[in-house]
């Protein structure tokens, strides 16, 4: 992601689309359990709020802790890269679990 704002927008769009699809399926497709669909929508909302809360993190070291500015920038870059990668992996795992639940509604 280019910045935190666009990452948060993408998280909101993805979760909103999933919730919309679940509501659409609940209302249009006969035989879908409304309680399970509502539970999935609640899970989507929880995933969204958790992911948005995790987007804010800070590098806890200062320039003085390193030998040079280059070492500081390198360490800071790798820290944020790993943090965003972890956030995206957790978010994608949550999305996969929700999609499996949504597909289970159709059985």
Please name every model-derived segment.
Residues 14-17, 31, 35-47:
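Alpha-helical segments in soluble extracytoplasmic regions
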Residues 22, 26, 48, 52-55:
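Short amphipathic alpha-helical segments enriched in hydrophobics
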Residues 1-5, 28-38, 74:
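Short, surface-exposed loop/turn segments at secondary-structure junctions
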Residues 40-42, 50-107:
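Low-complexity intrinsically disordered segments
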Residues 3-30:
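Short terminal alpha-helical segments
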